[in-house]
Amino acid sequence: MHEGRGAPPLLFVHGFACAHTDWKFQLEQFKKTHEVVACDLRGHGATPGQPHECSIEHYGGDVAALINNLELRNAFLIGHSMGCRVVLEAARLVPKRVAGIVLIDGSRAGSGDPDAAESAARAAIGGNYPAFAENLFRRMFFKPSVEADAIVARAVRSSAAFGAELWPRMARWDAAMVESALATVRGRILAIQSTARGADLKRSPLKPGETSPWLELLKSYGARIEIVPDTGHFTQLEAPQRVNQLIAEFCR
């Protein structure tokens, strides 16, 4: 999706087992005033791919190539969940084209030894990806809704061949690369956070003034933190007005 005119350009990247349609409220608003871009990553939505291509490194390279091909300048990269890693990786590859980054309800799936982080993530899947995906996504919502059910069902339907490879590779990237990626960001960073995730994958809602290890890490790299309370993991869908307000204020 590539619509709208106006600077600065905004590029939106979805999360694990998700699609660009998760940005529907943001795309509808910002295409009126900005050039907006949203893509389906390999193996997601309408974009084909092979399991060996599913990694944060591949996705970041794809987004960086898209930025170059569209000749975006002073762009703001906006990622949700896994998309936070992707925009950080893309910004590392094309730093001169990126003015800032917005990270929406990001987290860290692995730390310490990358091999151990990847192995632990594979063990968590346990050979039953649909059950893993349902457990993972059910915990992202605190209130029942038709939209929540649809997002969980989409994740369960997603390719086990992709998901069972991508999740461990994401944990490995978190352990190996997140600090260096944050250190190379030249532009500003805004974190819009609504939940904290534990090692058991369980999420808890955040209140204003609360923090988490992930947010403390971001603060150490100069990020601005904004808490959106009483909201699940899909902050941009559950609290679109607040998210859009924060994006509009930051991306100037």
Where are these regions (language model features)?
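Active-site loop/oxyanion-hole signature of alpha/beta-hydrolase fold enzymes
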Residues: 28, 37-78, 82, 228, ...
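Conserved hydrolase catalytic core segment
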Residues: 72-112
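Short N-terminal helix/helix-N-cap motif within the alpha/beta-hydrolase-1
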Residues: 20-28, 46-49, 85-86, 112, ...
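Catalytic histidine-centered segment of alpha/beta-hydrolase-like enzymes
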Residues: 228-240, 244
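Helix-rich cap/lid subdomain of alpha/beta-hydrolase
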Residues: 104-154, 158-183
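Alpha/beta-hydrolase fold catalytic core
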Residues: 1-11, 31-34, 73, 142, ...
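Conserved HGGG/HGGXW glycine-rich cap/lid loop of the alpha/beta-hydrolase fold
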Residues: 2-49
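Conserved loop-alpha-helix segment in the C-terminal half of the alpha/beta-hydrolase fold
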Residues: 188-231
